[in-house]
Amino acid sequence: MISKPDKNKLRQKRHTRVRGKISGTSETPRLNVFRSNTNIYAQVIDDVTGTTLASASSLKLTGTKTEQAAEVGKLVAEAAKAKGVEEVVFDRGGYLYHGRVAALATAAREAGLKF
């Protein structure tokens, strides 16, 4: 019998492969995205020191999932700018740049983050 591939394991492999190529510094931290079935989370991470500079999630937001993702992008951009971060490296977390991930990225760009 043919077994279906585990989507999350494939995503984790993609994420690990990409993480070998990108890294956040104190000047340009990494904007990491995690997407669950119900919520979306975003963090601005300085990989040199291993600290999270800003974060936002859709845990308390309402609306459609795409609208929530756009709001999270706006919130994380505002939090990052409050910490003095203007430019980031976008880490899509192994997800396709489509739908909620793209909505978050677009909203973060519109809120003033450069990537």
From Swiss-Prot:
Residue spans of biased composition, Basic residues class: 10-20
BP term (GO), one: translation
Superkingdom classification of source: Bacteria
Signal peptide: none
Pfam families: Ribosomal_L18p
Annotated TM spans: none
GO MF term list: 5S rRNA binding; structural constituent of ribosome
InterPro entries reported in the protein's UniProt record: Ribosomal_uL18_bac-type (IPR004389), Ribosomal_uL18_bac/euk (IPR005484)
Region (Disordered): 1-29
Keywords carried by this UniProt record: Ribonucleoprotein, Ribosomal protein, RNA-binding, rRNA-binding
UniProt GO cellular component terms: cytosolic large ribosomal subunit
Function summary: This is one of the proteins that bind and probably mediate the attachment of the 5S RNA into the large ribosomal subunit, where it forms part of the central protuberance.
Complexes and interactors: Part of the 50S ribosomal subunit; part of the 5S rRNA/L5/L18/L25 subcomplex. Contacts the 5S and 23S rRNAs.
Family: Belongs to the universal ribosomal protein uL18 family.
HAMAP family found in the cross-reference section: Ribosomal_uL18_B
Name under which the protein is recorded: Large ribosomal subunit protein uL18
